[in-house]
């Protein structure tokens, strides 16, 4: 014990239970999980209820992003909060400023996620099947993938789920999307008709 860091544990206050219950005051975030708490029955499943010193984890607790209010010390929901009370960089909320402007004034010290806008563009279904007629002007995303040589030659022992390369799916095109290749005689006939029409127009206009 010292004047700079006095030992205050032996001086309890009557309002401490209220602070722990309402604001999780002085509760260790790394405290163990309560073995009596049942997420289906709620706080009543634990004999100590909201006064329990251990953590009551909800089933949706680990599947959400980090709570914005908790990051600032302003969340009042405690363990009942539907967002994550944990500093996890992979589950941080998206930076609103970066998503709107394409840059962040707090970078590289920003605590929120900077998500590439291109990753939000939906995939092009035509490109996924093998060919997109719009090419580079397509508004959807074209993701380049390397085809599995073993699959292309007939068989891949790893299968689609475990193979790191792409296994293209053979899709039979619709009748309306089939390409028709003209014969040479059809092409030559069209050229002859165009030549005749050009000569006729020249005669009419007095160019010959």
Curated annotation (Swiss-Prot):
Q: Which InterPro entries does this UniProt record tie to the protein?
A: CPSF4/Yth1 (IPR045348), Znf_CCCH (IPR000571), Znf_CCCH_sf (IPR036855)
| Annotated S-S bridges | none
Matches recorded under SMART domains: ZnF_C3H1 (SM00356)
Q: Where in the cell is it found?
A: Nucleus
* A Gene Ontology molecular function term of the record: zinc ion binding
User: What keywords is this UniProt entry annotated with?
Assistant: Metal-binding, mRNA processing, Nucleus, Repeat, RNA-binding, Zinc, Zinc-finger
ZnF start-end (C3H1-type): 28-59, 61-88, 89-117, 118-145, 147-170
For this chain's UniProt record, which GO biological process terms are given? Answer: mRNA processing; termination of RNA polymerase II transcription, poly(A)-coupled
Q: Which cellular components does GO assign to this protein?
A: cytosol; mRNA cleavage and polyadenylation specificity factor complex; nucleus
Q: Name one Pfam family in it.
A: zf-CCCH
Query: What broad class describes the main subcellular location of this protein?
Result: nucleus
Instruction: Give the superkingdom in one word.
Output: Eukaryota
* General function of this protein: RNA-binding component of the cleavage and polyadenylation factor (CPF) complex, which plays a key role in polyadenylation-dependent pre-mRNA 3'-end formation and cooperates with cleavage factors including the CFIA complex and NAB4/CFIB.
* Other information: Present with 3690 molecules/cell in log phase SD medium.
Quaternary structure and interacting proteins, as annotated: Component of the cleavage and polyadenylation factor (CPF) complex, which is composed of at least PTI1, SYC1, SSU72, GLC7, MPE1, REF2, PFS2, PTA1, YSH1/BRR5, SWD2, CFT2/YDH1, YTH1, CFT1/YHH1, FIP1 and PAP1. Interacts with FIP1 and YSH1.
Q: Please state which protein family the record places this protein in.
A: Belongs to the CPSF4/YTH1 family.
Q: What is this protein called?
A: mRNA 3'-end-processing protein YTH1
- Which lineage do the record's taxonomy fields give for this organism? Eukaryota, Fungi, Dikarya, Ascomycota, Saccharomycotina
Question: What gene is behind this protein?
Answer: YTH1
């Amino acid at each position: 014990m010292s004047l700079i860091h006095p030992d205050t544990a032996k001086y309890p206050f009557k309002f401490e239970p209220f602070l722990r219950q309402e604001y999780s005051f002085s509760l260790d975030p790394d405290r163990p999980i309560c073995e009596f708490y049942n997420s289906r029955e709620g706080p009543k499943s634990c004999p100590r209820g909201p006064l329990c010193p251990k953590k009551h984890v909800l089933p949706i607790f680990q599947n959400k992003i980090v709570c914005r209010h908790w990051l600032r010390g302003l969340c009042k929901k405690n363990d009942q909060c539907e967002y994550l009370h944990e500093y996890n960089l992979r589950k941080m909320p998206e930076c609103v400023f970066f998503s709107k402007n394409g840059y962040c004034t707090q970078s590289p010290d920003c605590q929120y996620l900077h998500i590439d806008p291109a990753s939000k563009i939906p995939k092009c279904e035509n490109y996924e099947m093998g060919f997109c007629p719009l090419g580079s002007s397509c508004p959807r995303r074209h993701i380049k993938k390397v085809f599995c040589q073993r699959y292309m030659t007939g068989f891949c022992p790893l299968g689609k789920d475990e193979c790191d390369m792409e296994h293209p799916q053979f899709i039979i095109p619709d009748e309306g999307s089939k390409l028709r290749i003209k014969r040479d005689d059809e092409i030559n006939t069209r050229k002859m008709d165009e030549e005749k029409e050009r000569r006729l127009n020249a005669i009419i206009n007095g160019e010959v």
